[in-house]
Amino acid sequence: FGPGSVLSDVKTIAALKGNAANGKTAAAHCTICHKIGAAGVSFGPQLTNWGQARSIEEIVKEIMEPNAKLAHGFDKPVRLRKGTNIAEGMLSNFSWHAGSLKIKLFGGEVKKILFRRKGVKVEELKNHSWMPTPSRMGLSNQDVRDIAEYLKNL
């Protein structure tokens, strides 16, 4: 990501006038982990129709505060460690009896991990979203508002 930015609060950003065409361009940041139409990767929730039933303020809030409300099915972020190797992603299947789990990695690939192997540590991350904040992505207030406008009108 680029240099961080300082953003206003949700209400201030939601009150800006949004531009869906600019939002489509700014949403390229989102397609690193999300599908929007045919573009993007299936790591995070599908965003194609996601914004239609939400207010602009709700969309802005979800973008600004990704840890506040995790989407169903995306609420099991995990980190696996073995020595200096680390795998991070979303828990997709777990079998204590078999000693294995499936983790959805960034990019959408699913890997089976045998966690009972010596030295493998599984850390479940509570109330954690892999989605970075818009300030960490270097987005401006207007970028966030434009993305919200774009998602609302898909």
Q: What is each stretch, according to the model?
A:
Residues 18, 37-43, 68, 154:
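Inter-heme linker and motif-flanking segments adjacent to c-type heme-binding CXXCH motifs
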Residues 124-132:
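Small-residue transmembrane helix packing/gating motifs
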Residues 1-9, 64, 87-89, 94-99, ...:
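C-terminal capping alpha-helices of c-type cytochrome domains
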Residues 40-65, 76-125:
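Gly/Gly-Pro-rich "capping" loops immediately C-terminal to redox-active cysteine motifs
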